[in-house]
Swiss-Prot record:
The lineage of its organism: Archaea, Methanobacteriati, Methanobacteriota, Methanomada group, Methanobacteria. Its EC number is 7.-.-.-. Probably part of an ABC transporter complex. Responsible for energy coupling to the transport system. It is found in: Cell membrane. Belongs to the ABC transporter superfamily. It comes from Methanothermobacter marburgensis (strain ATCC BAA-927 / DSM 2133 / JCM 14651 / NBRC 100331 / OCM 82 / Marburg) (Methanobacterium thermoautotrophicum). This is Putative ABC transporter ATP-binding protein MTBMA_c05830. PROSITE patterns: ABC_TRANSPORTER_1, ABC_TRANSPORTER_2, CBIO.
Length: 278
């Protein structure tokens, strides 16, 4: 079942810039979907359509099979189902204390204080930030801020979480913690949609991948399908995952017969190497 869908959406900014050019996109319930593209391709603009922050110039966005209602009450309902975590957590965190920031969404849903308190406690526990309730967000590290921003969305209990460049600006440990958290949330049934230009990350965590370039979707499919079209990947100013690129070089320049498609992860490469050595 398609839990969220964009149908032929176009978007033109007030200055006349056409940012999206007939985008078709969907995610099924329980999927992890990656939107892969270079900077300026339209990833963030597309995401802002998914909970009604932006309204398409033409086309439509559907959540649970229903077109978004852009009235105030309609948007409140959509944002209870679809949560967006911005690339820069400083754009999202504004309250003087962590617990107040996480409580903002549930309070605006009209929940009573006991329910809000329970949701804040549970969300901070899930992201590993229990004990930080009274800390000022601006005193936190980049990874901690990102986790608090995710907690603020979790506290609203959405069905879909959308994250714009979730590992941007994080060191390897911080990035790993965020990705592990997203995997756990997906295991609990949440649909996860991420944007990234990190081609090494996408095959590890995604069920399906979309490639966006110049405001258009130019490829869609499983990681294996998408990365097997090398010309399209490089034509979008992206590259192969490091493992796949290494295998490409070994096969073309050193005559090692790996075959195609190229492995995309260390695990896949290890299995292919073991097969070669048998």
């Amino acid at each position: 079942m398609k839990i969220i869908e964009a149908v032929n959406i176009r978007y033109t900014y007030p200055d006349g810039t056409e940012a999206l050019k007939g985008i078709d996109f969907h995610a099924k319930k329980g999927e992890v979907v990656a939107l892969l593209g270079p900077n300026g391709a339209g990833k963030s603009t597309l995401f802002l359509h998914f909970n009604g922050i932006l309204q398409p110039t033409s086309g439509k966005v559907l959540v649970d099979g229903k077109e978004i209602d852009y009235s105030k009450s309609g948007l409140i309902k959509v944002r209870q189902k679809v949560g967006i975590v911005f690339q820069n957590p400083d754009d999202q965190l504004f309250a003087p204390r962590v617990d107040e920031d996480v409580a903002f969404g549930p309070l605006n849903m009209g929940l009573d204080e006991d329910e809000v308190e329970e949701r804040v406690k549970d969300a901070l526990r899930k992201v590993g930030m229990s004990g930080y309730e009274d800390r000022p967000p601006h005193h936190l590290s980049g990874g901690e801020k990102k986790r608090v921003a995710i907690a603020g969305i979790l506290a609203m209990k959405p069905d879909i979480m959308i994250l714009d460049e979730p590992t941007s600006g994080l060191d390897p440990r911080g990035a790993s913690q965020i990705l592990r958290l997203l995997h756990e949330l997906n295991e609990e049934g949440m649909t996860i949609i991420i944007s990234t230009h990190d081609v090494d990350l996408a095959p590890l965590y995604s069920d399906r991948i979309y490639i966006i370039s110049g405001g258009e979707i130019i490829s869609e499919g499983t990681p294996g399908d998408v990365f097997s079209d090398i010309d399209t990947i490089r034509g979008a100013d992206l590259r192969l995952p490091r493992i796949a690129h290494l295998v490409e070089i070994l096969q073309k320049e050193d005559d090692l017969p790996f075959g195609e498609p190229y492995p995309l992860t260390i695990g896949e490469a290890r299995r292919k190497l073991r097969d070669q050595l048998k």
